[in-house]
Amino acid sequence: MFSKQVTDSKVYQWFEERLEVQEIADDITSKYVPPHVNIFYCLGGITLVCFLIQFATGFAMTFYYKPTVTEAFTSVEYIMNEVNFGWLIRSVHRWSASMMVLMMILHVFRVYLTGGFKKPRELTWIVGVIMAVITVSFGVTGYSLPWDQVGYWAVKIVSGVPAAIPVVGDQMVELLRGGASVGQTTLTRFYSIHTFVLPWLMAVFMLLHFLMIRKQGISGPL
């Protein structure tokens, strides 16, 4: 993988002696790819790219976004109208969010239709389903952050859904809202979930997903 000029350098030799870089590189580049693999097997990778775009653009917006009920909408307007390329960053964030959901759905269909969920890949499928739930949760929590009329009522409806669950429903609603009604605590919790909890969960499950795919390989044709 590496040229002779690189492998002969002292820097490379230093890392090779400690980490066996060449063995790692050979393992990555020599993995067998079945001949039946086509463009539809790239849908999972495209979903990953969308997630990375989401992470980068979302991180950029945290420098300007203010998660308070009085300033959230104003800060979003500021990002769109005053920040250099802010309109582009937020637009890319929204577009890649929609693309991520679409690619995730298509990826799930591809795996199901080609039997990629069958033994011995059941755990890979389960982890993938968990990531699908996390992806939808990203959309639900992110939708509320501008705190406009659409965001407010979306939060009110979504956070009220668990009330239908027997015994623990009301407690779950109060946990989501941070109180009896939707307000500042609700926005703070949704912001924390969207920018901290869900990204970490997604990163952990993605790592597990990729390690299992790496170990088991790509599923064969039907």
Swiss-Prot record:
Membrane association type: Multi-pass membrane protein
Spans through the membrane: 39-59, 97-117, 123-143, 193-213
Residues annotated to bind heme c: 42
A GO-annotated cellular component: plasma membrane-derived thylakoid membrane
Necessary cofactors: heme b; heme c
CDD domains listed in its UniProt record: Cytochrome_b_N
UniProt: heme b 1 binding residues: 107, 209
Predominant cellular place of this UniProt entry's protein: membrane
Gene Ontology molecular functions: electron transporter, transferring electrons within cytochrome b6/f complex of photosystem II activity; metal ion binding; oxidoreductase activity
InterPro entries found in the cross-reference section: Cyt_b/b6_N (IPR005797), Cyt_B6_PetB (IPR023530), Cytb/b6-like_sf (IPR027387), Cytochrome_b_N_euk/bac (IPR048259), Di-haem_cyt_TM (IPR016174)
SUPFAM superfamilies (UniProt xref): Transmembrane di-heme cytochromes
Keywords attached to this entry: Electron transport, Heme, Iron, Membrane, Metal-binding, Photosynthesis, Thylakoid, Transmembrane, Transmembrane helix, Transport
UniProt cross-references to HAMAP family, sorted A to Z: Cytb6_f_cytb6
Subunit-level organization: The 4 large subunits of the cytochrome b6-f complex are cytochrome b6, subunit IV (17 kDa polypeptide, PetD), cytochrome f and the Rieske protein, while the 4 small subunits are PetG, PetL, PetM and PetN. The complex functions as a dimer.
Role noted for this protein: Component of the cytochrome b6-f complex, which mediates electron transfer between photosystem II (PSII) and photosystem I (PSI), cyclic electron flow around PSI, and state transitions.
Family: Belongs to the cytochrome b family. PetB subfamily.
Protein name: Cytochrome b6
Name of the gene this protein is made from: petB
